[in-house]
C-alpha cells in the first residue's frame, strides 16, 4: 500500500496482510517539490515518486520524511499539501545502507511530465541521473491506464530501461474499488477541488479503468 503523501492505511493494511500470511509492502506515493524546475505558473514543479520501505529502517525513514513534509513544507489555505523537497532525497543516497525502493512515478512522475511536455532529452537525462543515484533500488514504472498519453509514455519508458539498463516494474494506480464507482469518485474529487463535475473544460485526471 502506498497512500498519497502519507501512511494513513499502513497499520491496518499491515495487520490484515500478516493475518492472511501475506508479506505487506508499505510505502508513500509522495509529491516531490523540484528544486530546479517550475510549472506553468512559475511555481516549483510537483511530481510523484513512490517510495517503498525495504525493511523496518526504511519504514522509519518514510515516517521521518513524511513528518518533515507536514511540519516544514505544508501549503497554506486551500493548498494544504505536504510535499517532500527534492533535496531531501539526497539523504537516501548518502545513507550507508539502502532501505527504500524508489519507483519513477509513472506518467505523473518527473520523467512522465517531461515526456508529456515534449522535453524528451530532459526526460532521458532525468532517468539516467536517478538510475545513477539510486542504482538497483530505482525502477521505471510501466502503466496502461487508458490515458491519451500512455502510448507515448510507454514507448519512452521501455526505451529508457533498455538504454540505461534500468529495471521496469508494472504498476496500476487505483483510486476506487469497482469500475462502477468512477462517477462517485469524480463527484467526491470535484467537491474537494471545488470544480464543477459537468464542466467540459475541467481537467480529466481519472478514468473508469483506475479501479
Could you say what each language-model-derived stretch is?
Residues 1-211:
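Phosphodiester-processing cores and adjacent nucleic acid-binding clamps
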Amino acid at each position: 500500500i502506498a497512500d498519497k503523501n502519507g501512511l494513513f492505511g499502513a497499520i491496518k493494511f499491515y495487520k490484515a496482510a500478516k493475518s492472511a500470511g501475506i508479506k505487506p509492502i508499505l510505502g508513500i506515493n509522495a509529491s516531490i517539490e523540484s528544486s530546479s524546475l517550475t510549472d506553468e505558473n512559475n511555481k516549483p514543479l510537483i511530481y510523484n515518486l513512490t517510495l517503498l520501505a525495504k525493511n523496518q529502517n526504511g519504514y522509519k525513514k518514510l515516517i521521518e520524511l513524511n513528518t518533515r513534509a507536514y511540519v516544514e513544507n505544508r501549503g497554506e489555505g486551500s493548498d494544504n499539501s505536504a510535499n517532500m523537497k527534492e533535496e531531501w532525497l539526497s539523504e537516501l543516497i548518502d545513507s550507508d545502507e539502502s532501505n527504500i525502493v524508489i519507483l519513477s512515478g509513472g506518467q505523473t512522475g518527473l520523467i512522465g511530465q517531461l515526456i508529456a511536455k515534449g522535453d524528451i532529452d530532459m526526460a532521458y537525462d532525468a532517468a539516467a541521473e536517478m538510475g545513477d543515484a539510486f542504482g538497483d533500488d530505482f525502477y521505471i514504472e510501466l502503466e496502461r491506464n487508458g490515458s491519451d498519453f500512455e502510448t507515448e509514455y510507454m514507448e519512452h519508458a521501455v526505451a529508457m530501461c533498455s538504454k540505461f539498463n534500468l529495471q521496469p516494474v508494472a504498476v496500476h494506480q487505483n483510486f476506487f474499488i469497482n469500475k462502477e464507482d468512477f462517477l462517485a469518485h469524480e463527484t467526491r474529487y470535484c467537491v474537494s477541488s471545488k470544480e464543477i463535475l459537468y464542466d467540459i473544460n475541467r481537467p480529466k485526471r481519472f478514468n473508469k479503468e483506475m479501479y
